[in-house]
Amino acid sequence: QAAGILLPLLIIMDFSAIYLYWKKWLNNIVKIIIPASIIGILFGTFTFQYTNENQIRIVVGAISIIFVLVSFIQRNNLLLKPTNIKGYFWSSIAGYTSFLIHAGNPPINFYMLPLKLDKVSFIGTMTLAFLVINVVKLIPYYYVGLLAPSNLIVSLMLLPLAFVSVLFGYFLQKKIPEKLFFNIVYILLFLSGCKLIFDGVI
C-alpha cells in the first residue's frame, strides 16, 4: 500500500524537478540507465510474488555500505571504475529494486558516483532517469492492484509536501559547494544502506 501511495508522489516530484533541471542531463548516460532499468522493472513485475523483499533490502543495504567505505578508503579501486557494462548491470538492478522496495537510488549511485560528474549534470541525469522509471512502473503497479483510489487520495493530500521538498532541494543544491554536495550524497547513501538493513532485519 505504501508503494502505491509513494509512486504518484514520486512522479509529481520528478516532473517538478525535471522542469528545474531541463536539459541538464547527459544523454549518453541516460541511454544506458533507462533501457536497463525497464528490463529490471519487467523482471520485478513477473517475479515479485516469489521474492523475499527483506532479503533484497539487506543485500542492497550491505552493498551500499561497502561501496561508500571502499569509495572513501580506496578511491582508485578498480571495482569502482565506471564502465558501460557496470552501467547496464546496476541500472537493471535499480529498476528491479525500485519496483519491489522503492530503492532504485543506491544501485544507480553505484554506477553514477564513480563517473565524477558535476552536481547539476548528476542531478539532471538522475532526475530524468527516475522520471522515466517511475512512469513505467505505473503500468505494473496498476496491474498488481497497488494504485487503488484510496491510495491516490492519500497521495493528493501529501502533494504540498512533495512540491516543497523539490524546491528546497533545488535551492539547497545551488548553495552547496561541489565537494560538499557529493560528500553529502555518500553520507546519505551510507545511511540509506543502514536503514535498508534495519528494515530488512526488523
Which positions does each model-derived feature cover?
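Small-residue-rich hydrophobic segments that form or flank transmembrane alpha-helices
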Residues: 1-31, 90-95, 105-159, 163-166
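Membrane helix-loop-helix hairpins that form the core translocation module of multi-pass transporters
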Residues: 4-73
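Transmembrane helix exit motif
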Residues: 16-22, 59-83, 170-171, 191-202
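Hydrophobic alpha-helical transmembrane segments in multi-pass integral membrane proteins
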Residues: 43-49, 57, 97-103, 137-138, ...
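Membrane-interface helix termini and inter-helical loops of multi-pass transporters
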Residues: 45-55, 79-80, 141-153, 199-202
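Interfacial loop-to-transmembrane junctions
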Residues: 168-190
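Residues within membrane-spanning alpha-helices of integral membrane proteins
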Residues: 7, 61-64, 68, 127, ...
